[in-house]
Design a protein with these regions (language model features):
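Glycine-rich anion/phosphate-binding loop at the beta-strand->alpha-helix junction
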Residues: 130-133, 148-156, 161-162, 167-168, ...
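Active-site metal-coordination/substrate-binding segment of hydrolases
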Residues: 75-171, 175, 180, 200
Length: 326
């Protein structure tokens, strides 16, 4: 869903971009981009940037789209400003075959489409932001896929700005660095962005919520992958011998403070977020993301993960729990 109170160029670009599948794939998170389809949008954007006068627009081997726009006359001495958005969409729902359409919303439940003859709707109870959008035209998917507003809305906004500057180069602006990066949804984002070549003293990520919202700081972030090695024994002969990796995970997870989960935190409060777990008796893997604005508290959270693993290994008398933090 995306508010369409905007200029026609932004809307046209947005409707086009969301139809290009760019889902990242967490299973391939050891490579960038994690999915080849992200190159499809990257190449489109680079070509459009060149057509708009960004002669250096290019796509790197890792699917980063980078370009520069010269400053307007009289603003050459101003600090360069970066504008960043991400190409990929999340894999939590289907992302291919997006069919965007515009719904005029008058309040109440927002019906996006139908699936198997049943309406797909969002209620104001689950999405209170809808209360501020009555009377607006909203872009929705047909209910069978993601829409992809995160972050193709940001991509469209940046591209529309570049087009506006191309039409009127006298519009006051500093030198601009443009970057569209892959794999933000799986925690990589700007990881392989060449900051020196990007050449911007300041940068903003165009990826947010309500119109007019501005965030001027960011959290510290890490990903922790915790592996648990079990030992499978027939349940009838398991006493003193079986080590159930699934139960080890449960014990580990219980050692992390539940009040520091996303559903119990807000504002500057940091959290541990369990993103996924797979478990059998023999082996279990859990993946957490850790966030905190305070660097000291952030490090304490990482230390607690290591301490929890050490505690379980000490109890077991051998190393069966390992932690990798990125």
């Amino acid at each position: 869903m995306e508010n369409t109170t905007t200029n026609p160029d932004v809307l046209e670009r947005f409707l086009r971009y969301v139809q290009i599948n760019t889902q990242s794939e967490d299973a391939n998170c050891d490579q960038v981009p994690s999915s080849a389809v992200q190159f499809d949008l990257a190449n489109v954007l680079a070509e459009e940037l060149r057509e708009l006068g960004a002669e250096d627009a290019h796509v790197t081997e890792h699917a980063y789209v980078c370009a520069h726009i010269p400053a307007s006359a009289g603003a050459e001495d101003k600090p360069a400003l970066g504008l960043i958005a991400h190409l990929d969409t999340t894999e939590v729902a289907p992302g291919a075959g997006v069919k965007p359409h515009i719904v005029h919303y008058e309040g109440g439940d927002l019906v996006c489409g139908t699936v198997d003859g049943k309406p797909v709707a969002m209620s104001t109870a689950k999405l209170p932001a809808l209360n501020d959008l009555a009377g607006e035209d909203l872009v929705c998917s047909d209910g069978t896929t993601l829409l992809g507003a995160d972050d193709k809305a940001g991509v469209a906004e940046i591209m529309s700005l570049v087009a506006r500057i191309a039409q009127d180069p006298s519009l006051p602006h500093p030198a601009l660095g443009i970057c569209f990066c892959p794999d933000e949804e799986i925690g990589h984002g700007a990881e392989l962005l060449d900051i020196d070549t990007f050449g911007c003293k300041y940068a903003y990520t165009v990826d947010g919520g309500p119109i007019g919202e501005l965030e001027w700081e960011c959290f510290n972030a890490a990903e922790a992958t915790v592996c648990f090695e079990g030992q499978s024994i027939h349940p009838g002969d398991a006493k003193g011998r079986m080590v159930n990796a699934g139960n080890l995970f449960c014990d580990f997870n219980a050692l992390l403070p539940y009040v520091q989960r996303p559903e119990y935190t807000e504002g500057y409060e940091g959290f541990y977020h369990l993103e996924g777990v797979s478990a059998t008796v023999d082996h279990a893997t859990a993946r957490y993301i850790v966030r905190d604005h305070d660097a000291a508290k952030f490090q304490q959270k990482l230390d607690l993960i290591d301490a929890a693993a050490s505690m379980l290994n000490q109890r077991l008398g051998e190393e069966r729990v390992t932690v990798e933090i990125k």
